[in-house]
Amino acid sequence: MLKPSIDTLLDKVPSKYSLVILEAKRAHELEAGAPATQGFKSEKSTLRALEEIESGNVTIHPDPEGKREAVRRRIEEEKRRKEEEEKKIKEQIAKEKEDGEKI
């Protein structure tokens, strides 16, 4: 018998198609090294994903486009922060060179 049971899993998602997509995406994340949300009984990433879905630790985002936009904003913000940090470092190096030439 499949553990977790399909009936239990279908209580967590709107349809069996959503379940398959969610399981596949989470299994890929786990294979890529994403941190687990719990301890597992299973060895395979697909079964681990099902365990997380059953426990409620992994769910479908209610607004996927909103999530994508939030991720885009976070990436852009991180990029801006890195550019500002790089600019400050370059300014500091230029200032140190200028101070070194004065001596």
Curated annotation (Swiss-Prot):
Give a GO molecular function annotation for the protein.
DNA-directed RNA polymerase activity
| Keywords on record | DNA-directed RNA polymerase, Nucleotidyltransferase, Transcription, Transferase
Q: Which domain of life is it from?
A: Bacteria
Instruction: Enumerate the Gene Ontology biological process terms.
Output: DNA-templated transcription initiation
Basic and acidic residues bias: start-end ranges: 62-103
A single Gene Ontology CC annotation of this entry is: cytosolic DNA-directed RNA polymerase complex
Region annotated Disordered, chain positions: 52-103
SMART domains referenced in this protein's UniProt entry, alphabetically: RNA_pol_Rpb6 (SM01409)
Q: What is this protein called?
A: DNA-directed RNA polymerase subunit omega
Q: List the disulfide bonds.
A: none
Organism of this sequence? Streptococcus pneumoniae (strain ATCC BAA-255 / R6)
Q: Spell out the reaction equation it catalyses.
A: RNA(n) + a ribonucleoside 5'-triphosphate = RNA(n+1) + diphosphate
